[in-house]
Amino acid sequence: MEYVPDAEIWDLYNENRELLGKDHIRGEQLPIDGYHLVVHVWIRNSKGQYLVSQCSANRPTHPLMWECVGGSVVKGEDSLSGAIREAKEEVGVDLMPENGQVLFTKTRKIIEGKIFNDIMDVWRFEYDGEVDLGNATTDEVAQVAWMNREQIKELFDANMFVDTLEYFFTEVDK
């Protein structure tokens, strides 16, 4: 593997979530037998609303679409650390580890004809603190909002919510 400055490096796993001892550079083709760890983070307040974010217009994937916090776990991180880091980076929120739980894990090989090869942990965190995008460390998000199930469904039905997150209605907010 060639060194690339500022590249995001992932640990590679096999299908059974066992570390392979190999690194992978984001953006390169994943090996057929290599998987990387990703997290989706649903942040819920005591009113039963979820913090969702609208992707910035310049983001390469899903510009101006709404979604939950999420991203790839980087080399040396575990799923929980990745979930907490992504929440801070994307929406400026400091989540407490004890307020989170993994709802389910899914291994995804191919989505819409594209090789994904990821192991996705879906987290839900309870959070009633302030949300200030000024504390975010990336510019991936244009805006955030607390929404209930019906509001998220309206966005989804209007094709304004990332379609691979449809599991929200059956697995996250049951």
Question: Can you say where each PLM-predicted feature lies in the sequence?
Answer:
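Acidic, metal-coordinating catalytic segment for phosphate/diphosphate chemistry
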Residues: 1-40, 44-46
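The catalytic Nudix box helix
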Residues: 51-52, 68-102
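Nudix hydrolase/Nudix homology domain
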Residues: 19, 27, 63-64, 75, ...
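Conserved hydrophobic "DFG−1" position in protein kinase catalytic cores
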Residues: 12, 43, 52, 124-125, ...
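Active-site segment of metal-dependent pyrophosphate-handling enzymes
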Residues: 37, 47, 57, 88, ...
